[in-house]
Amino acid sequence: MIKNRKIGHVGLATNDIEATVQWYLEVLGFEVIGDFKNPAGAPIKFLKRGDIIYEVFQPIGGATAPGKIDHLCFESGDIEADYQYCCEQGYTFEKEGIQELPTVWEKGARFFKIMSPSGEAIEFCQVM
């Protein structure tokens, strides 16, 4: 079992990132704490209110299910060890291997996602 992991953020896919972000700011009092683009140029914004962090992103080509929570992210202090453990347990991965996202935060992030039995993605992410 992967223990003692803090929830890092909840990922939300949208087809209109500006309207979605504005709604969270005005209606729920969130603030923007990160404004990035992925390597393909698609926008990603991190919003925070108290201990809650949302990653709002607009995939190129549109969200497959806009408004649906895309993933739940847990922080990782050792992404390689967590990935190895999940491999040993035989979990189903969204994509094989540890993914890198160099365009977020100061030094980028590394992550992988496993799939739950009901289909949601569970992400483990290490900010570099």
Name each model feature, range by range:
Residues W23, E80-Y85:
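Short amphipathic alpha-helices within nucleic acid-binding modules
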Residues M1-A19, D70-L72, S76, C125-M128:
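N-terminal beta-strand motif that seeds the catalytic metal site of vicinal oxygen chelate
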Residues D35-K37, P59-G61, I98-T103:
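Short, solvent-exposed loop/turn elements at beta->coil junctions and helix N-caps
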Residues E26-V27, Y85-Q89:
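Short amphipathic alpha-helices in soluble, non-transmembrane regions
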Residues P43-K45, D70, G108-F112:
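Short beta-strand micro-motifs in enzyme catalytic cores
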Residues I2, L12-I53:
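Core segments of cupin and vicinal oxygen chelate
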Residues M1-K3, C87-M128:
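Vicinal oxygen chelate
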